[in-house]
């Protein structure tokens, strides 16, 4: 399952220092897909993938001192098309 993770940065320089020193600090089974950061270094929109939501919670525990999180389960457009087609039949 994919999740849109919206991160609201408290301290961008500290976040990037930790990222440089420790990496993403993700448990096995949680996969980083891609991310986009606004020009003001205040918000990051990140797509993560896992079959176990608990892994996402563990990852958040490693970063929650430096940012606030909003987690939204998402589907690809292709998945939605297939879902709608199945419901129509």
Predicted regions span which residues?
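Conserved, structured core segments of small domains
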Residues: 1-89
């Amino acid at each position: 399952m994919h999740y849109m993770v919206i991160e609201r940065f408290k301290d961008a320089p500290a976040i990037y220092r930790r990222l440089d020193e420790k990496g993403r600090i993700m448990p096995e089974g949680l996969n980083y897909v891609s991310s986009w950061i606004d020009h003001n270094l205040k918000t990051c929109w990140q797509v993560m993938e896992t079959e176990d939501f608990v892994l996402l919670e563990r990852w958040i525990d490693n970063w929650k001192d430096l940012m606030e999180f909003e987690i939204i389960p998402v589907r690809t457009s292709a998945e939605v098309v297939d879902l709608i087609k199945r419901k129509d039949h």
